[in-house]
């Protein structure tokens, strides 16, 4: 067994390619990019390259339709500005011929105890959602709604969008 799969299971996937049914989901957060220090330790670098060049490299390698599957921001980064920046990256990818099939802000509502990966029940709330836990829409939720309203009629008519 390698990675919980038998050799026969590996061979099945090699003999039955499913690439035509795949979408590559790329998450991107402000904390994704990391610098390796001289002593080998890691530190968050913030955004150096950004979603566009990283995702474009993945698309060039794998030639699969792409979905921006997760993004949000915490710790001093303006969520509305971040949303608009990520949307601009997605739109540029589409303009450059990358088949982009979706965009998601994660999560719909604030997250509880994600700072401990749900291992502890502390009731710690990370205010990352489009809405708070009482379903009050945050400014980033209003901005997301505005993006949808502005683009919903245009996106299906663009010649380089949603083509798989």
Sequence positions of predicted segments:
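Non-catalytic scaffold segments within catalytic domains of secreted glycoside hydrolases
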Residues: 1-164
């Amino acid at each position: 067994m390698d990675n919980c799969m038998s050799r026969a299971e590996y061979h099945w996937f090699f003999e039955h390619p499913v690439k035509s049914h795949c979408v590559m989901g790329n998450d991107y957060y402000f904390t994704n990019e990391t610098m390796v220090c001289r002593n080998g330790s890691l530190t968050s670098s913030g955004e150096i390259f950004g979603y566009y060049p990283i995702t474009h490299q993945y698309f060039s390698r794998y030639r699969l339709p792409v979905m921006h599957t997760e993004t949000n921001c915490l710790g001093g980064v303006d969520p509305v500005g971040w949303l608009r920046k990520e949307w601009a990256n997605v739109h540029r990818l589409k303009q450059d011929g990358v088949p982009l099939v979706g965009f998601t802000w994660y999560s719909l509502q604030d997250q509880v105890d994600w700072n401990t990966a749900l291992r502890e029940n502390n009731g710690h709330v990370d205010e990352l959602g489009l809405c708070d836990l009482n379903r009050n829409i945050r400014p980033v939720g209003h901005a997301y709604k505005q993006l949808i309203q502005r683009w919903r009629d245009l996106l299906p008519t663009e010649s380089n969008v949603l083509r798989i």
